[in-house]
């Protein structure tokens, strides 16, 4: 068996692993980095990977930190916000709608994962990162100062890769987490099926009501949103991808799964025909390109960062829920923490304290994000509950976590120590409100539709908090954070 030595080994060459390799190389171009990837490049376009939509943190990370702004604008789609529809019968324009009439300041994107990962592959190989394609990681051994990854190829060629840093980006496979026995369940139970069709589904075509089209600017571009078709215990996503392909998913609580069968695409289409007939009709005879199902998709991890030369990023560590598209946010945040730890270690610093603090921060972010979903799916068909929930969840996300990320404060331990008390206070406010939403969700209310359009652009606090993210990172963050938290407290009453 051959042995190869490097500074860093990253297990997994998907979005999380490629971004981490690039970020580490940007910080230290002399780092010898190896990425172990079981599949090969180039990826096919519109590859079957969930995680096709970004929100503000993930979009900023890809655009600015990864330097992909031009690529995102040229090869992917500018997202027209998150949009929720309530009801299923009659004209689409007669349903109730929560969403923006125009884009907010900070761009977000609908991304083709194959296209994006191919670009990142080129970027990191140009920077000198070695990507071992067609190489499956069979086992990980943590051995003090030098760790080992034992790999195999389709040709049965075994190799041991050694490095002082093993960084796991293996996604739901969770290689390092399983090695350590750090799997951990949580209190949120969610299930999903998703598939792609070889057809651009433009949700605007579901209504011919010109007055409805005129509500948004630009007109007839609602299809660029992450469109959510809402119901008691479930939501259906309709996400456009590049090159006239559409991703469709159904995300549901256990009660919906028990009431309906989703084991096959035929069962899924039958369910759509009853519960979201407009969506089923739009799919029509389009070719189903794939079909994926997963039960109990949400999970935790006992620890994701260590001073002993290992860490996990993205879904290799934790996963909350797809509703607000937070996957690329968690990649951005975990990669930022990992890059800081590797950089400090390279400089000869003791990183024990920093690793422990980053773990605490990250676990707090995870818990707050998880609270947005736990025991709340029953209320997803309730327009009144969701209008209040989206207002709070957006302000909480933009006003606190997004501000800290955009200002570069999450790895500033002295700042986070100063900010800890107000953050704890607003987290308690969030927990109180989420508990109220959970109580409302138990009723599984479906209200009669009234053709209401709740325009998020008409809510001044949303525009204000999103606009603040455009300010430069050197603007005093603690002052703005305290102002934002005071504003959120007033909203919560």
What are the functions of these language-model segments?
Residues 2-16, 34:
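Beta1/beta-strand and adjacent pyrophosphate-binding region of the FAD-binding site
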Residues 25-50:
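Glycine-rich FAD pyrophosphate-binding loop
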Residues 43-89:
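N-terminal FAD cofactor-binding segment of flavoenzymes
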Residues 101-122, 257-263:
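Short beta-strand to alpha-helix junction loop
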Residues 123-278, 335:
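Predominantly flavin-linked oxidoreductase catalytic cores and closely associated redox partners
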Residues 232-234, 240-242, 256-380:
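FAD/FMN-dependent oxidoreductases across multiple families
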């Amino acid at each position: 068996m051959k042995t190869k030595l490097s500074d860093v080994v990253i297990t997994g060459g998907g979005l999380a692993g490629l971004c981490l390799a690039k970020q580490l190389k940007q910080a230290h171009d002399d780092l010898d980095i190896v990425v172990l990837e079981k599949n090969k490049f180039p990826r096919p376009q519109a590859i079957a990977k969930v995680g096709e939509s970004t929100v503000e943190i993930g979009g900023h990370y890809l655009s600015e930190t990864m330097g992909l702004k031009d690529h995102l604008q040229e090869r992917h789609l500018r997202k027209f916000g998150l949009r929720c529809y309530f009801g299923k019968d009659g004209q689409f324009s007669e349903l109730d709608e929560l969403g923006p009439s125009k884009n907010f300041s900070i761009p977000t994107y609908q991304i083709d994962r194959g296209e994006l990962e191919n670009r990142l592959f080129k970027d990191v190989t140009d920077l000198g990162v070695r990507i071992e394609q067609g190489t499956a990681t069979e086992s990980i051994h943590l051995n003090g100062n030098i760790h080992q990854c034992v790999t195999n190829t389709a040709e049965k060629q075994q190799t041991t890769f050694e490095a002082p840093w093993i960084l796991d980006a293996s996604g739901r496979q969770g290689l390092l987490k399983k090695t350590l026995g750090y799997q951990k369940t949580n209190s949120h139970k969610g299930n999903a099926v998703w598939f792609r069709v070889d057809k651009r589904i433009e949700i605007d075509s579901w209504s011919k009501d010109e007055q409805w089209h005129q509500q948004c600017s630009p007109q007839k571009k609602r299809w660029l949103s992450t469109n959510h078709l809402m119901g008691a215990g479930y939501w259906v996503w309709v996400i456009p991808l590049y090159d006239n392909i559409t991703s469709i998913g159904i995300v549901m609580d256990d009660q919906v799964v028990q009431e309906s069968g989703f084991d096959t695409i035929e069962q899924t289409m039958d369910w759509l025909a009853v519960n979201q007939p407009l969506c089923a009709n739009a799919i029509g005879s389009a070719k189903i390109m794939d079909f994926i199902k997963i039960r109990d998709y949400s999970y935790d991890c006992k620890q994701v960062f260590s001073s002993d030369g290992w860490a996990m990023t993205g879904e290799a560590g934790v996963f909350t829920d797809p509703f607000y598209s937070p996957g690329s946010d968690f990649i951005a945040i975990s990669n930022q923490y990992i890059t800081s730890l590797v950089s400090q270690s390279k400089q000869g610093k003791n990183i024990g304290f920093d690793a422990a603090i980053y773990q605490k921060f990250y676990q707090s972010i995870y818990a707050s994000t998880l609270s947005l979903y736990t025991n709340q799916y029953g209320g997803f068909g309730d327009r009144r509950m969701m209008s209040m929930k989206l207002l709070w969840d957006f302000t909480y996300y933009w006003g606190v976590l997004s501000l800290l990320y955009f200002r570069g404060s999450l790895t500033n331990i002295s700042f986070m120590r100063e900010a800890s008390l107000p953050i704890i206070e607003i987290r308690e406010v969030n927990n109180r409100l989420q508990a109220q939403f959970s109580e409302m969700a138990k009723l599984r209310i479906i209200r009669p539709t009234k053709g209401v359009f709740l325009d998020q652009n008409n809510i001044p606090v949303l525009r204000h908090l999103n606009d603040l993210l455009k300010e430069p990172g050197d603007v005093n963050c603690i002052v703005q954070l305290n102002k934002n938290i005071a504003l959120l407290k007033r909203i919560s009453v």
